[in-house]
Amino acid sequence: MPTRAVSDTLDRVMPSRLQCLIVDDSDAFCVAARRLLESAGMSVVGTATSLASAIDAVLSTHPDLVLVDIDLGADSGFDVVEAIDAQDLTPPPAVILVSTHDEEDFADLVNNSSAQGFLSKFELSANAIEALLGT
């Protein structure tokens, strides 16, 4: 199973101060997630709706954390995760996959990806992110 070191940035920054990029093709989810995370003190540096726009946003905003929807319509969230990993960023952003589907539906794919893990969209919160990242 591929592993990814949590970025040095995450060791220095409180979870509520993380700079987050949201990658999802649902405008409604992006708006709701932004409000939820910003109300907890996180900074949302942008949103993206596709693999190409996600890579552009990662390179231009340098987020500490990227939340990636597994189903992006024409693109796969797993492809986004691997494309981010291929950028060889230092430090690399932490990547968390999100979905409305159950974690069990994607467990093997999540475990074999370079993402830190999975969160259900219904359980998304700053506390859940903090728990998943172990910070």
Report residues per predicted region.
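The feature encodes the CheY-like receiver
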Residues: 73
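Acidic catalytic/metal-coordinating carboxylates
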Residues: 50-53, 76-79
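Non-catalytic signal-transmission and effector/linker regions of two-component phosphorelay proteins
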Residues: 1-19, 29, 124-135
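Active-site T/S-Asp motif of two-component receiver
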Residues: 66-69
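As written
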Residues: 77, 109-117
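Conserved acidic segment of CheY-like receiver
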Residues: 17-28, 33-37
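Short hydrophobic/Thr-rich beta-strand motif most characteristic of the beta2 strand and flanking loop
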Residues: 41-49, 57
